[in-house]
Design a protein with these regions (language model features):
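A detector of single, family-specific signature residues
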Residues: 1-465
């Protein structure tokens, strides 16, 4: 007999007789690179739609006009970075400004213009049909700006490393084959000596660090190549630029450390003492060289690095994206939905057509996914969960499921000030075995059979530990 698919019957909603005007003093702004179009209710001005250039003086004039029109709420689309100056000015002037996703406010086809867009935003906001995008507090926004700029510096330095590798390969210097990282101790010593004019492979191989896996003879064989002036010139310039970016990274770390100290100083009273780190390790490549755990603990009152997969640097990046106030999301389900780590159910005809997660460029979600990917190789409860899900439905979905579980742990830790204690992979496997045995016993009883332990010959009647 063919199994019937489960039908989803959503609860019917009662339509109101008329939409209520929740924000009668609302305006809509369509942001552009050269000018902003602003719409206020028609009864507030003889010209309810006006345009303002993007110069600072004109933005203040825009705020003055909204004040004269008795506007209290403002809605605008997230258009590139053009919205940031007007958002900050209006927010500082006391307006309740929300930033909305452009996909959520699409107008009807054939009605796309700057004037109609700002009027559409105004009408939707007056009726309370718009939901503002998340934007953390100003202090966290500044921290986010520093760390996003730091990520840009790292990516730019990475592009320079690729160009140096290209120059080496063009000269048939196979240094990347014998050195895992050409910007490590051994690699940089050899590169600087090559740029300085040294060509003898025996001399260059003496720069080998004792921790390098390749032998000195292997390095000598890799450094016999065809030195050409154009490739040496490219190698020299890229190496000099790489050093510049490393200096910029150091300066950026100083700014981040100072800003963290400023944020932590505003917390009163100070939290309890910092717990002992679960594991002691040196900062990895591209991670800050200063103490990150102490100011983060002062800022949040908890130590997120106690959670498996969330090291100090990941905790810093997460807080710069989500902030410290978890009350912005009513529950962990709202939080994971905002991260696009929750299923997006598509139901038609009473049937569930798809439950895939929504594609997104959410930076916090990317951090959770990367942490989940690394957890698969650990002997922790989260690692055991990842391996169980990966065996059942594949690695891609296991990464999403583990990232969602990590996000819930971070949410509850920050909101309720909980302390995470890892039960270990063995405890998780034992709990999972108990759950599987219980389901097997229930299934056997439903079919009129019993479940017997082959090693002892006893009938399984209850949960097995």
């Amino acid at each position: 007999m063919k199994r019937q698919r489960r039908r989803h019957t959503p609860k019917p909603r009662q339509s109101p007789a008329a939409l209520e005007r929740l924000h009668p003093h609302a305006a809509g702004i369509d942001c552009g690179s050269a000018e902003h179009f602003v719409a206020v209710p028609p009864d507030r001005d003889s010209t309810p739609v006006q345009s303002f250039p993007t110069f600072t003086a004109d933005l203040h004039r825009l705020a003055d006009w909204l004040t004269a029109c008795r506007i209290t709420h403002v809605a605008m689309e997230a258009t590139g970075v053009y919205w940031i100056p007007v958002f900050e000015i209006l927010d500082a002037r006391g307006f309740q400004v929300i930033l909305v996703n452009a996909r959520h406010v699409k107008n009807l086809p054939g009605r796309k213009s700057d004037v109609s867009d700002c009027e559409w935003l105004r009408d939707l906001h007056i009726l309370g049909l718009l939901r503002g995008s998340f934007r953390p507090a100003d202090g966290i926004v500044a921290l986010r700006g520093y760390l996003r700029h730091r990520t840009t510096l790292i990516e730019s330095a990475g592009a320079l490393v690729q160009r140096m590798q290209k120059a080496l390969v063009q000269m048939n210097l196979q240094l990347p084959l014998v050195v895992s990282d050409i910007t490590g101790v051994t690699g940089l010593r050899i590169l600087r000596d090559i740029v300085a004019g040294q060509r003898d492979p025996q001399h260059l191989a003496r720069h080998r660090d004792y921790r390098c896996h390749a032998s000195e003879a292997e390095i000598v064989a890799a450094l016999v190549g065809n030195y050409r002036p154009e490739h040496l010139f490219a190698l020299q310039q890229n190496l000099e630029l790489f050093d510049v970016y490393q200096g910029q990274l150091t300066a950026c770390d100083v700014a981040v450390e100072a800003h963290l100290a400023t944020l932590a100083a505003t917390i009163t009273p100070p939290p309890a003492s910092l717990p002992v780190a679960r594991r002691r390790q040196k900062p990895r490549n591209n991670e800050p060289r200063f103490d990150v755990r102490t100011p983060l603990h002062q800022l949040t009152g908890v130590d997120l690095s106690q959670i498996d997969g969330i090291g100090p640097y990941n905790a810093l990046r997460l807080l710069s994206e989500i902030g410290t106030d978890m009350t912005r999301w009513p529950s962990d389900k709202h939080f994971t939905s905002w991260l696009t780590l929750a299923p997006q159910n598509k139901i038609s005809g009473g049937r569930l057509l798809s439950s895939r997660t929504q594609p997104s460029k959410n930076r916090a979600a990317a951090i959770f996914r990367m942490a989940a990917m690394n957890l698969g190789r650990t002997q922790t409860a989260l690692g055991a969960f990842y391996r169980r899900v990966a065996f059942r439905i594949g690695k891609a979905k296991a990464i999403t499921a583990t990232a969602r579980k990590l996000a819930i742990l971070v949410y509850r830790t920050l909101k309720d000030h909980l302390v995470y204690v890892d039960p270990g992979a063995d405890a998780y496997d034992a709990k999972d075995r108990t759950r599987v045995v219980r389901r097997l016993r229930q299934r056997a009883e439903h079919l009129g059979f019993g479940l017997v332990n082959l090693s002892t010959g006893e009938v399984v009647e209850g949960a097995v530990s």
